[in-house]
């Protein structure tokens, strides 16, 4: 007689590894991490989705403040008091809000990007299927620096962000390929005015320019040290077949992925499946007024969240 218990999702651990579960056995030529970046309304989401479909990879849309809501429970989006006390509409309406809203927003988004990147790595190591992501925690800093340049946030926020960024992504492996879509700011503004949400149309052109400068002057040079880089104009990015051809010609002969083996992949998989551990560095104990709340308010919000 066979005993049948309740069905449970088994978590990967050392026993699975001892029994022969190896990441490299599942890998194919497309078992890679690709990221697609660009300014607002640059068409990065469309290109990322097309690449994923063409190469049989998994597409990860850009992580927003509700990323955790969408992947847990029944997918219901919870109020902003459970999501960092922030929202995009308020940011565009008042980017210099004196209560520190702009930094709360970007810090919360960064945490969600870190969580999503961990999910992407876990998917790759578990299934062998490659992933294509719309932005990542590696490029997120261009928004924070643009906010600082525009006077939206205080220097202490910039310093805090740099600290949590360094300690939160150092355990990850960077993307194999970073794709950048270069759309001039005037064209970005035109697209936002034509198809953007009403509050997005208030975005400052100088803020958009700072985002572009951050990508070109800092992100691309830095990521090129460990990852392959492809850059396209908006028109070139429309030709997905040409993009796929360019990807196929890449050698992928640099970066830390080349130094990995089944043992290191085993430890990485253990790390990225522990989502609480992944997010611990994002919540280091520092007194930053913009993102700090009182104990009573914390307790009230916490128990409200538990009751949802």
What are these regions (language model features)?
Residues 47, 51:
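Hydrophobic positions on the alpha1 helix immediately C-terminal to the Walker A/P-loop
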Residues 140-214:
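A glycine- and Lys/Arg-enriched "phosphate-lid" helix/loop adjacent to the NTP-binding pocket
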Residues 44:
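Conserved lysine of the Walker
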Residues 53-104, 140-144:
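Conserved substrate/cofactor phosphate-moiety recognition/catalytic segment
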Residues 1-28, 308:
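N-terminal mitochondrial targeting presequence
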Residues 2-7, 190-308:
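NTP-dependent small-molecule kinase module
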Residues 36:
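Hydrophobic anchor at the beta1->P-loop junction of P-loop NTPases
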Residues 93-172:
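Glycine-rich phosphate-binding loop used to anchor ATP phosphates in small-molecule kinases
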């Amino acid at each position: 007689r066979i005993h049948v218990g309740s069905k449970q999702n088994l978590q990967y651990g050392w026993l699975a590894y001892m029994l022969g579960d190896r990441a490299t056995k599942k890998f194919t030529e497309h078992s890679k991490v690709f990221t697609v970046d660009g300014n607002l309304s640059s068409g990065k989401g469309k290109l990322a989705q097309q690449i994923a479909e063409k190469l049989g990879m998994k597409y990860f849309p850009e992580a927003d403040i509700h990323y955790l809501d969408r992947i847990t429970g029944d997918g219901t989006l919870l109020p902003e008091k459970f999501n960092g006390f922030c929202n995009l509409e308020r940011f565009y309406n008042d980017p210099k809000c004196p209560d520190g809203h702009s930094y709360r927003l970007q810090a919360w988004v960064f945490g969600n990007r870190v969580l999503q990147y961990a999910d992407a790595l876990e998917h790759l190591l578990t299934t062998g299927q490659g992933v294509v992501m719309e932005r990542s925690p590696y490029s997120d800093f261009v928004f924070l620096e643009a906010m600082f340049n525009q006077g939206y946030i205080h220097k202490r926020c910039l310093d805090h962000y740099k600290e949590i960024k360094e300690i939160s992504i150092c355990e990850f492996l960077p993307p194999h390929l970073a794709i950048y879509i270069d759309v001039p700011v005037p064209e970005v503004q035109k697209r936002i005015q034509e198809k953007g949400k009403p509050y997005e149309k208030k975005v400052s052109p100088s803020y958009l320019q700072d985002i572009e400068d951050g990508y070109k002057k800092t992100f691309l040079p830095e990521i090129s040290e460990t990852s392959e880089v492809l850059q396209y104009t908006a028109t070139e990015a429309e030709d997905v077949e040409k993009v796929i051809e360019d990807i196929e010609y890449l050698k992928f002969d640099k970066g830390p992925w080349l130094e990995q083996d089944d043992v290191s992949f085993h430890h990485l998989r253990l790390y990225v499946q522990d989502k609480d551990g992944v997010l611990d560095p994002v919540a280091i104990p520092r007194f930053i007024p913009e993102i700090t709340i009182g104990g009573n308010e914390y307790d009230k919000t916490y128990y409200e969240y538990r009751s949802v």
